[in-house]
Amino acid sequence: MDYEFKMKTQQERAKVEDLFEYEGCKVGRGTYGHVYKAHRKESNDTKDYALKQIEGTGLSMSACREIALLRELKHPNVINLIRVFLSHTDRKVWLLFDYAEHDLWHIIKFHRAAKATKKPVMVPKGMVKSLLYQILDGIHYLHSNWVLHRDLKPANILVMGEGNERGRVKIADMGFARLFNAPLKPLADLDPVVVTFWYRAPELLLGARHYTKAIDIWAIGCIFAELLTSEPIFHCRQEDIKTSNPYHHDQLDRIFNVMGFPQDKDWEDIRKMPEHHTLTKDFKRSNYANCSLVKYMERHKIKPDSKAFHLLQKLLLMDPNKRITSEQAMQDPYFSEDPMPTADVFAGCPIPYPKREFLTDEDQDDKGESKRQQQQQQQQQANQQAQQNQQQQANHQNQQQNQQQQANQQNQQSQQQQQQQQMQQQQQAQAGGMDHSAAKRVRMSGPNGQPGNGMNQQDYQVQQAQQAAAAAAAAQQQQQQQQQQQMMFNNQQQGGFQQRY
């Protein structure tokens, strides 16, 4: 490409900073980048817009996927991508959307805080129904076009504020969305872990490779329950961590504590899940015998015979093949009873929720410092755990060494006892031989203990010296612990021998 033509094209290309005013109007941040509330410069257009700056330089795969899908998808309940800005100077990417003043995360947070007061304010029933219907309508459109959202959660469900689309639901953040009509490989191979843990379907947690649009339905069921109770139904303390292993023990435990352990008859394919062996090893069915969705919702004052509960049950079926579809859910009797769902989820009433606050760099620094402190605490806990593990290993090794020493001592004592028994047997045999020789000499001796006719005085003295030497040699063979006993025994033997003579 001609250099001059390239430079001319860049100069003519619109720049986001020339068209929009957004400085000091940051309303959101995340791993994706930053979001600003913006309005046009030098224009009669008073409409507010959302400018999403993609983190990093250039286009990431997630950004490319989101741009490609949103340029094709057009539905009242799916966020509208108006324009894409590419800055060739700093290689920044900007996405321009319609601005939504509210989202379900802030709305539910507002009502959860109200529950702590003496006069709790729940999300109005009509508003819950309208929110759910519009979410289902938007997801039905995505599924009809072979798109899985894969990251549905309250923060990604936007609600428009005052304006032409007041109270309209907008499904946002398509960074994890995928086409599923004919993937080149199993979806689990592309992204092993998707969806925030609290809204993750059980088949994902058990390592399903060929998962379907039922994972979005499970997430909608979680959002529905949260709207009814103002509490995350499958709240788990574990943070959302990207990992290649989809199995998550604590999240499964939380699901079973609410739903109960799945029966084989209720989920026939559970044995085919890649992590089924780990599941049976880590969990006992009997621990969740008294758990059920009925009991959980009754604690939150949701009657099990209500149409809302019946629909919730269909959305939160463990078996993805039995889980209701978005189209079937929209035709559920829940939506045909009063109050009927409305296009404006606020039903024309004043909006009680505060507008988004602008974030400052100090907020960012505070959050960064808080994050660093949290990381330091986690590191300290990890170090303490490692030290405890090392101490346990050292204690175990010391215990093994002590046991080995005790075993060696027992073996030595056993060997000493055997040697003592053998020596005693030898001594008894020698004593018997000495008694026999003494008796023979008595028969051969004359009066007053003198040698008899068969032995002269010299032979007698030689024989006596030999016997004394033999007794001394036997005494030396005994161990130190038995020396005194052996010497007493020899003295007794010698004393008896002298008495005979």
Swiss-Prot record:
Any GO molecular function: protein serine kinase activity
Annotated compartments: Nucleus
Positions with a binding annotation for ATP: 27-35, 52
Keywords annotated in UniProt: Activator, ATP-binding, Kinase, Nucleotide-binding, Nucleus, Repressor, Serine/threonine-protein kinase, Transcription, Transcription regulation, Transferase
Pfam families for this protein: Pkinase
Entry EC no(s): 2.7.11.22, 2.7.11.23
Cofactor dependence: Mg(2+)
Active site: 151 (proton acceptor)
Region (Disordered): 333-501
Keyword Transcription regulation applies: yes
Start and end residues of each Protein kinase domain: 21-335
Biased composition (Low complexity): 373-431, 446-501
GO biological process, one term: G1/S transition of mitotic cell cycle
Catalytic activity: L-seryl-[protein] + ATP = O-phospho-L-seryl-[protein] + ADP + H(+); L-threonyl-[protein] + ATP = O-phospho-L-threonyl-[protein] + ADP + H(+); [DNA-directed RNA polymerase] + ATP = phospho-[DNA-directed RNA polymerase] + ADP + H(+)
Principal location: nucleus
GO cellular component annotations of the record: nucleus
PROSITE patterns xrefs: PROTEIN_KINASE_ATP (PS00107), PROTEIN_KINASE_DOM (PS50011), PROTEIN_KINASE_ST (PS00108)
Family assignment from sequence similarity: Belongs to the protein kinase superfamily. CMGC Ser/Thr protein kinase family. CDC2/CDKX subfamily.
Self-association state and partner proteins as the record states: Component of the Cdk8 module of the Mediator complex.
Record's function text: Component of the Mediator complex, a coactivator involved in regulated gene transcription of nearly all RNA polymerase II-dependent genes. Mediator functions as a bridge to convey information from gene-specific regulatory proteins to the basal RNA polymerase II transcription machinery. Mediator is recruited to promoters by direct interactions with regulatory proteins and serves as a scaffold for the assembly of a functional pre-initiation complex with RNA polymerase II and the general transcription factors.
Name listed for the protein in its UniProt record: Cyclin-dependent kinase 8
Species annotation: Aedes aegypti (Yellowfever mosquito)
Gene that specifies this protein: Cdk8
